[in-house]
Amino acid sequence: EFSLFIRLRDCMPNGYFKCISCGQIKPFEQADNGHYINRQHMSTRFDEMNCNAQCRHCNRFMEGNIQNYRKGLIAKYGEQRVVLLEAKQGISRKFTDFEYEQLIKYYKALNKKLKKERGL
C-alpha cells in the first residue's frame, strides 16, 4: 500500500509522473517507488520524504541514480531537510505487527482517495 501511495501522490492529474532522479515524464504504470536511503534502514523505509516516484531505469538499472535523486530531493524539500533525512538512517527502528497493520489501513484509505482524485 505504501509503494502505491508514493506513486499516486507523485502522479500528475494527467496520469503521468516526473522521475525524481532524471526528470523524465512517464506514464503512471511505469513508476517505481524509489527509496533515496536504502530500504534496509527501517528508520527511513516508510518516510514519505525518502520515497518518491522514480522511473524504472533509474531505480532498477542505475541503482537509484542517487546523486541526481539527492538533487531532486533538494529541489523538492530543501537541503536542510535532506541532511536531516540522511541523519535518520543511522537510527535503529523496529516496527511491531500492530504498527504495520496501522500503516496498511492508513495508506489503503489514502490510496482510495488518491485513485479517485487522479482518475486511476
Residue ranges, per PLM feature:
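Histidine-centered nuclease catalytic patch
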Residues: 18-51
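Short microdomains enriched in Cys/His and/or Lys/Arg
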Residues: 39-51, 74-89
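Short Cys/His-centered divalent metal-binding micro-motifs
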Residues: 23, 27, 51-77
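Short flanking/linker segments adjacent to small metal-binding domains or redox-active Cys/His motifs
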Residues: 81-120
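Short, charged surface segments at domain edges that flank catalytic/cofactor-binding sites
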Residues: 1-18, 93-97
